[in-house]
Regions:
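Sec-dependent N-terminal signal peptides
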Residues: 4-13
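Cytochrome P450 heme-binding "Cys pocket" and the immediately downstream C-terminal segment
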Residues: 16
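Buried hydrophobic residues that stabilize the cores of well-folded domains
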Residues: 19-146
Length: 146
């Protein structure tokens, strides 16, 4: 009985890893396709902050495919890219530059399933955290909402 339960848990873990791996492969393909397209209609919106900011929306055939935000807040710059398919965020890249700390840069990557649940997160040190059932409470993991 113990061997049977152990085998069951092992199989669930392998299936979960396989599902995440398949989704990540799909995300990378969509990401490459989005970035290879060169004829986007780009809408720019200035954000009235004390240090400034901008939102750029990239449309292909009137469908929103990518959003880039840049915000300056005191001694930092926050740059984010949201990748969108079928109206939902599937990947987010976040780069924070700290000007007061020798221009230190911190990168984070967020991967989402088809329902915008965070399934994989890569922290600034490169550590990968993944869970097919969704990850909760990761700073900066918000999806794009217009």
């Amino acid at each position: 009985m113990k061997k049977m339960l152990l085998s069951l848990f092992l199989m669930i873990g392998i299936c979960s890893f396989s599902t995440i791996r398949q989704r990540i492969t799909e995300i990378k393909k969509d990401y490459a396709e989005t970035n290879s397209y060169k004829s986007y209609r780009i809408e720019k919106e200035r954000i009235d902050l004390s240090e400034g900011g901008e939102i750029r929306r990239y449309y292909k055939n009137n469908v929103l495919r990518k959003v880039v935000t840049e915000f300056y807040t005191g001694h930092t710059k926050q740059y984010a890219e949201y990748y969108i398919k079928n109206g939902k965020t599937y990947f987010k890249y976040l780069l924070t530059t700290y000007f007061y700390n020798g221009n230190k840069k911190e990168e984070k990557r967020y991967y989402y399933d088809n329902h915008e649940n965070l399934i994989r997160y890569i922290d600034p040190s490169g550590k990968i955290i993944a869970n097919e059932n969704g990850l909760k409470d990761y700073e900066g993991s918000e999806v794009w909402e217009d």
